[in-house]
Amino acid sequence: MLENLSTEHRNEKTMNLDEMSIKEVLQSMNEEDRTVALAVENEIEEIEKVVQIVTKSFEEEGRLIYIGAGTSGRLGILDAVECPPTFGTDDNMVQGFIAGGLKAFTKAVEGAEDREELAKEDLKSIGLNEKDTVIGIAASGRTPYVIGGLKYASSVGASTASISCNKNAEISKYAKLNVEVETGAEILTGSTRLKAGTAQKLVLNMISTASMIGVGKVYKNLMVDVQSTNEKLVERSKRIIVEATGASYEVATECYEKADRNVKAAIVMILLQCEYGEALEKLKGAKGFVKKAL
């Protein structure tokens, strides 16, 4: 089975990897990494379809759920945890599950990825339903945990998609949409945390960012739903208001505080010269889209 996966093949360019100088190793890695974005480009049309179903889930108050094992699971969790501070989502809107539970994020849990039923249990625990979208991530495209999750997701009517790094992946049989980014042989044979992991991260970035744009979390190219959870983000919020409105830093700061640190509301207040309450009403009527509120 493994010998049929391109991610498990030996890379002809790095047969003498153990004899290379440090610089040669780094140059080889860099050369291989340059091929990843091109491999992702080949899947843009399928990624677009995935974004459409995720956006639909969000519009219907559904959720985006990532499932994976090992590096794939960690990448899903990484994308999920960045959504609340970046886009102002609640913790449930985008979630990530890894085979073996959160403890597997820092330490491998032996055998967890081989059990289909664990994914079913994880998805059952959050009350997965037909409004949700489940995306299974597996570089090999054959992880039982991911297959089990996709099977269960389909059984409850949830939308499904898969991300793998091999063509004709096994998991593609269990999802409606399938992103198969063929990254090929790694410089270190079978180490799919390298090119395959990079490809998965790029695809996840695309899916979450484009979906959030689709539900009004972005104005122009500004992340106007940013949550001010630390000093850096407070300053970023004020700068976003300045960029969006052309107001002075002082005016932006004043409106930011008047708007209870709601960046969108502060922008509307300045551009429409209205009070906080009116700004909130306009945003509500525009379903959170700043451009429509204006």
From Swiss-Prot:
It comes from Bacillus mycoides (strain KBAB4) (Bacillus weihenstephanensis). It is an enzyme of class 4 (lyase). HAMAP family: MurQ (MF_00068). PROSITE patterns: GCKR, SIS. The keyword Membrane does not apply. GO terms for biological process: amino sugar catabolic process; N-acetylmuramic acid catabolic process; peptidoglycan turnover. Transmembrane segments: none annotated. Keywords: Carbohydrate metabolism, Lyase. This is N-acetylmuramic acid 6-phosphate etherase. Belongs to the GCKR-like family. MurNAc-6-P etherase subfamily. The gene is murQ. Its EC number is 4.2.1.126. It catalyses: N-acetyl-D-muramate 6-phosphate + H2O = N-acetyl-D-glucosamine 6-phosphate + (R)-lactate. The lineage of its organism: Bacteria, Bacillati, Bacillota, Bacilli, Bacillales.
